[in-house]
Amino acid sequence: MALSREETARRYGTAIFDFAKDSGKTELMYSELTELKKAVQAEPRFVQVLSNPVLDAKQKKSLLTAVEQGFSAELQEVLNFLLSYDRFDNLVDIIDYYIHLYNAANHIGTGVAKTVLKLDEDQLQRLADSYAKKYGLQALHLENEVDPEIIGGVVLEVEGRVIDGSVKHRLEKIRAMLTK
């Protein structure tokens, strides 16, 4: 029975996290996997080629060897492992699960800040630091989404929690109070 994408990501992501933990390289693996994910998203053909059943294992290995030279021995071992089990089509999902485990182990949150105007890096970082401090996180990685419908303010969505500080939400609350 074939594994679902989610189950494959969970199993392999957990195995990679355990491997990195045992070798004391979780942070190094995190940074390298994050960089690899960015590269793969910028050039998705890389995964398509290494997942292509038409290419034989020797061709795939030579392509991978050319790419992995800038990475640590541990990540090279992981990439060769994934290649040997034909799991490169799940690479981004596996990396995402590793990042999820790393963030959970290090009390790092991820989320989205919706605003009317794009926040600069300093504003986004101050917002993330404030939220992290309030909710006991070591750090918070926020992405900024522009949503003109909120009129003003900020809507934070972090780890399943929503804090709606938007003008739209405040107006809806006032409208509800007035109609009672």
UniProtKB/Swiss-Prot annotation:
Cellular component, GO, one term: plasma membrane
Membrane topology listed for this record: Peripheral membrane protein
Keywords: ATP synthesis, Cell membrane, CF(1), Hydrogen ion transport, Ion transport, Membrane, Transport
Record-linked Pfam families: OSCP (PF00213)
PROSITE patterns: ATPASE_DELTA
UniProt GO MF annotations: proton-transporting ATP synthase activity, rotational mechanism
Alphabetized InterPro entries for the sequence: ATP_synth_OSCP/delta_N_sf, ATPase_OSCP/d_CS, ATPase_OSCP/dsu
Domain of life, source organism: Bacteria
SUPFAM superfamilies assigned to the protein according to its UniProt record, in alphabetical order: N-terminal domain of the delta subunit of the F1F0-ATP synthase (SSF47928)
Subcellular location: Cell membrane
Annotated family: Belongs to the ATPase delta chain family.
Job description of the protein: F(1)F(0) ATP synthase produces ATP from ADP in the presence of a proton or sodium gradient. F-type ATPases consist of two structural domains, F(1) containing the extramembraneous catalytic core and F(0) containing the membrane proton channel, linked together by a central stalk and a peripheral stalk. During catalysis, ATP synthesis in the catalytic domain of F(1) is coupled via a rotary mechanism of the central stalk subunits to proton translocation. This protein is part of the stalk that links CF(0) to CF(1). It either transmits conformational changes from CF(0) to CF(1) or is implicated in proton conduction.
Assembly and interaction partners: F-type ATPases have 2 components, F(1) - the catalytic core - and F(0) - the membrane proton channel. F(1) has five subunits: alpha(3), beta(3), gamma(1), delta(1), epsilon(1). F(0) has three main subunits: a(1), b(2) and c(10-14). The alpha and beta chains form an alternating ring which encloses part of the gamma chain. F(1) is attached to F(0) by a central stalk formed by the gamma and epsilon chains, while a peripheral stalk is formed by the delta and b chains.
This protein's name: ATP synthase subunit delta
Species classification: Bacteria, Bacillati, Bacillota, Bacilli, Lactobacillales
